[in-house]
A protein has these predicted regions:
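Structural/interface elements that position substrates and couple domains in central-metabolism enzymes
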Residues: 1-5
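Short Gly/charged-rich anion-binding patches and loops
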Residues: 6-7, 70
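NAD(P)-dependent Rossmann-like dehydrogenase/reductase catalytic/cofactor-binding core
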Residues: 13-14, 19-120
């Protein structure tokens, strides 16, 4: 949680966005996705190959190890790319991908109803 707050404070401090803007973006974007899927589910839906590509250059800026995450890279090398390959952090083989997509969309809709459409 503090890592997100640290970055949010930096965005506000450099004048890139207001406090309200940052809260709105996180609630409607990352917050909504993480509430429905968690970080591993979000990565599976986004494609582990995409996250691994980002991992190769961005992790060095965020972590003292100066290299990307080994587990993620090994999964991509093994063809485990998430939903699009049928296997990632979770199993999406057979009909499981379609079921996961339907469930994700259902959760997004329910969360949006609660957060944005039930205001009194």
């Amino acid at each position: 949680q503090f890592a997100v707050l640290r970055e949010a404070l930096h965005i506000v401090d450099i004048g890139a966005a207001t406090i309200e803007d940052v809260d709105t973006v996180l609630k409607a974007g990352m917050g909504l996705r993480y509430a429905a899927l968690g970080p591993f589910g979000v990565a599976d839906f986004g494609g582990l190959d995409t996250f691994d590509h980002i991992n190769t250059y961005l992790n060095a800026e965020l972590d003292d190890s100066k290299v990307g995450n080994k587990r993620l890279h090994e999964m991509v090398e093994a063809g485990k790319l998430g939903v699009k390959s049928g296997q990632g952090f979770y199993d999406y083989s057979g009909d499981k991908a379609d079921e996961a997509i339907r469930e994700r969309d259902r959760m997004y809709i329910e969360l949006a109803k609660v957060l944005y459409f039930n205001k009194k």
